[in-house]
């Protein structure tokens, strides 16, 4: 069963409001829009001093009604399929910066009411793909991936200057061209244009329709060449109605480089990967769960080969081995970096699941080789279970104007209707959430990766030692030695700290027992995931999942009758006097035990492995007395933090790995291949495996 859909009254903006915030460009006819897109693509090859290789990155200032984006994606899709253009097999990344977040419901309303797609029916398929990806009205970047990674769209919603200034630049793949939409051109100022320049190649061009002279001057003053397209483009070829001005001022280009250097220095405590590997040189991954599987997929979408070393005989035998797991975002009253990251990550994971599920259902030979993922986006209903938890939940609900697609408050009657069983208390409903089978998710990701790149999996291969020799990593298992690998990722869950190189990572294992209870009587009618003191899923293959225990430093990982009873007790405490609770039968002693690796701040760990010994040695050197405290702070703020070159960490997913793991893997894959990231600096700092030490050192505190 599936929960009732969210209420339409949750959406507050009507068409007149939307068309005011997201107006169409001056080029409104199908011909003029196509001409503009062809012009943009042709300029990529004629303006650039370097050939387009691997990845083309384009920027867009404003979303408008979205037609410019749709036209670009449609043309790129068509041309890469026919391979008649210079970009050939090159992938496309479009980074759109829009101050006013919009969701799929409002986008559809905008397109339907304006009838803008009626005369542009060739854009309808890509428009449908955007809508299916369900962009949400949240602050931050949402990464949308299409065509097995050949097309990627980053929607940066929120304050424009913050979005630009907090975005890391990727030296190997800077933005090659900008399109400035008319309705936001007037908002451009010098600080914003210089941040655009920091993120762009030296020969990047800024294109606009009827650009004002002030905008062109701002662009020229930061080293941009400009291309001003006239509205007359609707009458013919765009090249007949444009003004182009090329700027080659070495001083301005030097200023760009200084901006990049300043940004790197300011974020030195969050180091970047040092070197890229050739695509045929595999990235080594130790693991076998959801994190490592999604990393393989993200790498494969970039054409990067990888080799997995898994200690079990198949994927998903660790923490990813549960029959069902809840997937929904972690929200905080402050909507801080943690909350915003989990919203971005949850939506990304949801798109991954839908894309992989679609791949497994296609009537092709390759589809037969992609594992089907059992899942149901039936929503998640969160309620309090005692006075303290209810106060905490109320604070989350009342502290922010949450987008309805993320979560909205429901009263007791609405909760009953959503759950289809008696709840009789108010709650918070996450309409896009639900449950998914983690090990099938992992298998489907690796299946898909194997279709896109050279992927190898070594099962029953427990890595017992890793060593670095001559800037390369070697792995040891039962007398075998694997390597050399220039890049090694440890994504091995509960075994993350088993190697000396990472044994001091500040992360803890927690045992979790999930009970399997038969679907029967009223309990079988449950239509959404319940989260209170513990969680309960709708039935799958005749069983519900009830959990989970949370035991630190567990002495064993066998079935525990006491934890089985405690899981039941949590539901009894959460929903007292409800008849369906009596239908929960744990007498079969059916359960599964796993180990979750948890960090104190609830962020996963993703990035370069810290050289803890070197950090501590430098700490002793720079923290000799109180007078040197300020000097020490400056040192750690401006000096690249010590790392173990070529070694990376992907773990600490805790109990929310289904939400956080895929985006963390995507970001690490982007780092390993030198590509632009969908996360900003503040979030990357929170994810960095060295953060527990550097957080104190940056404040001049003792370790």
Curated annotation (Swiss-Prot):
Cofactor(s), by name: FAD
Alphabetical UniProt keywords: Cytoplasm, FAD, Flavoprotein, Methyltransferase, Multifunctional enzyme, Oxidoreductase, S-adenosyl-L-methionine, Transferase, tRNA processing
GO cellular component labels: cytoplasm
Major location category of this protein: cytoplasm
A molecular function (GO) term: flavin adenine dinucleotide binding
Transferase found in the keyword field: yes
One of the GO biological process terms: tRNA wobble uridine modification
E.C. number(s) listed in UniProt: 2.1.1.61, 1.5.-.-
Localization: Cytoplasm
Pfam family, one: DAO
Renumbered residue ranges of the record's region tRNA (mnm(5)s(2)U34)-methyltransferase: 1-281
Similarity remark: In the N-terminal section; belongs to the methyltransferase superfamily. tRNA (mnm(5)s(2)U34)-methyltransferase family. In the C-terminal section; belongs to the DAO family.
Primary role: Catalyzes the last two steps in the biosynthesis of 5-methylaminomethyl-2-thiouridine (mnm(5)s(2)U) at the wobble position (U34) in tRNA. Catalyzes the FAD-dependent demodification of cmnm(5)s(2)U34 to nm(5)s(2)U34, followed by the transfer of a methyl group from S-adenosyl-L-methionine to nm(5)s(2)U34, to form mnm(5)s(2)U34.
This protein's name: tRNA 5-methylaminomethyl-2-thiouridine biosynthesis bifunctional protein MnmC
Organism: Shewanella sp. (strain MR-7)
């Amino acid at each position: 069963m599936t929960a009732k859909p969210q209420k339409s009254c949750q959406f507050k903006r009507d068409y007149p409001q939307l068309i005011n915030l997201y107006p169409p460009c001056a080029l409104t006819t199908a011909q003029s829009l196509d001409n503009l897109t062809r012009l943009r693509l042709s300029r990529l090859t004629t303006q650039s001093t370097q050939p387009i290789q691997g990845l083309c990155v384009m920027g867009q200032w404003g979303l408008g009604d979205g037609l410019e984006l749709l036209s670009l994606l449609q043309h790129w899709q068509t041309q890469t399929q026919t391979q008649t253009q210079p970009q050939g097999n090159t992938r496309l990344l479009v980074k759109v910066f829009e101050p006013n977040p919009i969701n799929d419901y409002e986008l559809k309303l905008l397109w339907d009411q304006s009838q803008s797609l009626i005369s542009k029916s060739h854009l309808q398929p890509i428009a449908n793909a955007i809508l299916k990806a369900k962009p949400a009205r949240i602050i931050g970047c949402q990464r949308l991936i299409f065509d097995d990674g050949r097309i990627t769209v980053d929607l940066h919603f929120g304050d424009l200057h913050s979005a630009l200034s907090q975005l890391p630049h990727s030296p190997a793949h800077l933005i090659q061209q900008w399109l400035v939409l008319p309705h936001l051109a007037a908002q451009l100022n010098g600080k914003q244009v210089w941040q655009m320049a920091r993120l762009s190649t030296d020969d990047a061009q800024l294109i606009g329709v009827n650009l004002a002279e002030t905008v062109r001057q701002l662009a020229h003053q930061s080293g941009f060449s400009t291309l001003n397209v006239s509205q007359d483009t609707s009458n013919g070829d765009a090249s007949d109605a444009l003004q182009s001005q090329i700027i080659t001022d070495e001083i301005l280009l030097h200023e760009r480089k200084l901006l990049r250097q300043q940004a790197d220095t300011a974020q030195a405590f969050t180091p970047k990967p040092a070197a890229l590997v050739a695509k045929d040189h595999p990235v080594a991954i130790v693991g076998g769960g959801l994190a490592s599987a999604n990393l393989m997929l993200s790498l494969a979408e970039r054409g990067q080969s990888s080799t997995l070393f898994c200690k079990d005989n198949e994927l998903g035998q660790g923490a990813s081995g549960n029959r069902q797991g809840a997937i929904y975002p972690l929200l905080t009253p402050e909507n801080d970096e943690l909350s915003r990251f989990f919203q971005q990550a949850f939506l990304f994971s949801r798109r991954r699941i839908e894309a992989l599920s679609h791949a497994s259902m296609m009537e092709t030979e390759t589809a037969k080789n992609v594992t089907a993922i059992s899942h149901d986006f039936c929503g998640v209903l969160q309620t309090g279970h005692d006075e303290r938890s209810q106060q905490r939940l109320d604070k989350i609900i009342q502290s922010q104007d949450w987008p309805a697609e993320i979560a909205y408050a429901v009263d007791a009657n609405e909760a009953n209707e959503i759950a289809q069983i008696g709840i009789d208390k108010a709650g918070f409903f996450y309409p896009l959430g639900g449950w998914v089978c983690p090990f099938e998710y992992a298998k489907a990701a690796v299946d898909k990766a194997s279709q896109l790149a050279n992927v190898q999996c070594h099962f029953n291969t427990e890595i017992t030692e890793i060593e670095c020799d001559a800037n390369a990593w070697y792995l040891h298992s039962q007398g075998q030695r694997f390597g050399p690998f220039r890049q090694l990722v440890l994504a091995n869950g509960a075994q993350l700290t088993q190697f000396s190189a990472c044994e001091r990572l500040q992360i803890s294992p927690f045992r979790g027992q999930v009970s399997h209870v038969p679907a029967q009587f009223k309990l079988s009618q449950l239509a959404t995931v319940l989260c209170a003191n513990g969680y309960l899923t709708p039935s799958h293959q005749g069983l519900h999942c009830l959990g989970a225990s949370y035991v630190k430093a567990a002495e064993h990982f066998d079935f525990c009758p006491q934890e089985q009873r405690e899981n039941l007790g949590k539901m009894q405490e959460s929903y007292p006097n409800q008849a369906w609770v009596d239908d929960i039968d744990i007498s079969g002693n059916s359960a599964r035990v796993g180990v979750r690796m948890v960090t104190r701040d609830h962020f996963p760990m993703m990035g370069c492995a810290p050289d803890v010994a070197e950090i501590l040695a430098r700490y002793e050197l720079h923290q000799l007395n109180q007078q040197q405290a300020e000097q020490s702070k400056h040192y750690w703020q401006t000096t690249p933090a010590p790392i173990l070159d070529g070694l990376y960490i992907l773990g600490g997913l805790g109990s929310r790995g289904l939400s956080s793991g895929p985006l963390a893997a995507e970001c690490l894959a982007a780092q390993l291949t030198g590509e632009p990231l969908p996360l900003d600096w503040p979030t990357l700092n929170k994810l960095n495996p060295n953060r527990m030490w550097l957080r104190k050192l940056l404040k001049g505190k003792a370790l």
